[in-house]
């Protein structure tokens, strides 16, 4: 499929029949990350050029914006529905305090980023879940953003690419959270019934409630 021709694979021992990748050239002034698997310190620039995969084959987790930079053509992403935010309908103790703290630490307003972009020159709608925002859990705002994106894609006859990184339903929102699975599934079905393409990318971690 031409839509997927841009995809390339990282170089590592797991993808090359056990052969080791080239030795890491380290610069003392460059920030590094320690691989939890092989315990080596790897320069951030080396990880970035290799899709955040260590030479031993360990995959580092990525934020939504990092994945966006890998997936979308440069300067093609236009964010949608960022004004849809969490509200505390159940008055769950300390919920909004946690949300505000998470917004600061993750630099995102919610657990999903939605918009339009070009991937390999192909226009599409794109959503990426943010693991640093309450483990990418699906609350009412997340469900509403994704539903609106599929409705937008159906109206404009665009394919959708979705990156799921989620710990499941957001317990602080109770039934309002559980309702989102039915709502988003309905929007996905209408998009499919219109004969449009949807590519879900399941990444670590993705639990059954949001697949």
Language model feature labels by segment:
Residues 198, 210-211:
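Extended, hydrophobic alpha-helical segments in both membrane/secreted and soluble proteins
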Residues 201-208:
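Glycine-rich beta-to-alpha transition loops that act as phosphate-gripper elements at the mouths
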Residues 1-196, 205:
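Terminal-region recognition feature
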């Amino acid at each position: 499929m031409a839509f997927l021709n841009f995809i390339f694979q990282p170089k590592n021992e797991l993808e090359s029949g056990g052969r080791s990748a080239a030795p890491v050239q380290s610069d003392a002034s460059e920030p590094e990350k320690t691989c939890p698997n092989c315990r080596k310190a790897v320069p951030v620039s080396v990880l970035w050029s290799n899709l955040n995969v260590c030479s031993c084959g360990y995959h580092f987790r990525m934020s939504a914006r990092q994945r966006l930079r890998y997936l979308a053509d440069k300067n093609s992403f236009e964010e949608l529905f960022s004004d849809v935010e969490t509200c505390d309908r159940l008055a769950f103790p300390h919920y909004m305090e946690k949300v505000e703290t998470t917004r600061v630490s993750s630099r995102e307003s919610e657990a999903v980023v939605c918009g339009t972009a070009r991937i390999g020159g192909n226009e599409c709608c794109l959503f990426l879940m943010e693991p640093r925002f309450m483990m990418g859990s699906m609350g009412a705002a997340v469900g509403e953003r994704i539903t609106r994106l599929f409705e937008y894609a159906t109206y404009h006859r665009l394919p959708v690419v979705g990156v799921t990184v989620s710990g499941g339903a957001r317990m602080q929102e109770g039934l309002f959270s559980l309702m989102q699975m039915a709502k988003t599934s309905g929007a996905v079905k209408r998009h499919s019934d219109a004969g449009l393409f949807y590519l879900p990318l399941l990444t670590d971690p993705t639990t059954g409630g949001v697949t």
